[in-house]
Amino acid sequence: MTAQGLYYLIRTLVALVAIPFHEAGHALAAWLLGDDTAKREGRLSLNPLKHFDLLGTLCMVFAGVGWAKPVSTDPRNFKNPKWGMALTALAGPVANLLLAYLAMVAWKLLYYWAPVTEGTVLVARFLQYLVYMDVGLAVFNLIPVPPLDGSRILLAVLPQRIYFGVMKYERVILIIVLAAVWGGFLDGPLSVLNDLVWNLLDLGTFYIDRIAYATYYASLGAVI
């Protein structure tokens, strides 16, 4: 397999993990807050087939921005519909950030203590791409424009008249945002935000670096 083919294979596998985690996060939050609509539709699952959208997944793999089937919610089932929708929306990016943190922990453990083999190099590359994609999904979805998760979070703080006035143009706004992303117009701001989140995750797993350095210097002392 060529290097480019391997790259896209790993990105495909990463997408099949990151996207279901995001959507299952929405479904879990909705269920915990009193709405079982997504659970009844089978969306409380990490099975990629439950969330799979062919075009959205292909766009994620090849263009870096994509989508899955939207998770259905019924605001009437929430005790507080406004905050129920906002917290359910927030749960998707939070799920991605949690997965990114766990992937970075695993990646560092592999980097410091696993023997260097062809297999461990592939796993390390998978974990690294998983962190990148999860961070990218979280950051992109928090953009406060419809129909991204950030717009649902705005519902909790904006007057309903303004919010629903904006939502009338949801499809047009989405096309503009996707065109801006694919055209590279948002590369700068998104890169800055992605790097910021990556650095925070790196800082949050710094204890692994310290343990690795301490172990290394202790082994030097034992040899001496």
Task: Give the ranges of each region predicted by the language model.
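Hydrophobic transmembrane alpha-helices and their immediate loop junctions
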Residues: M1-I224
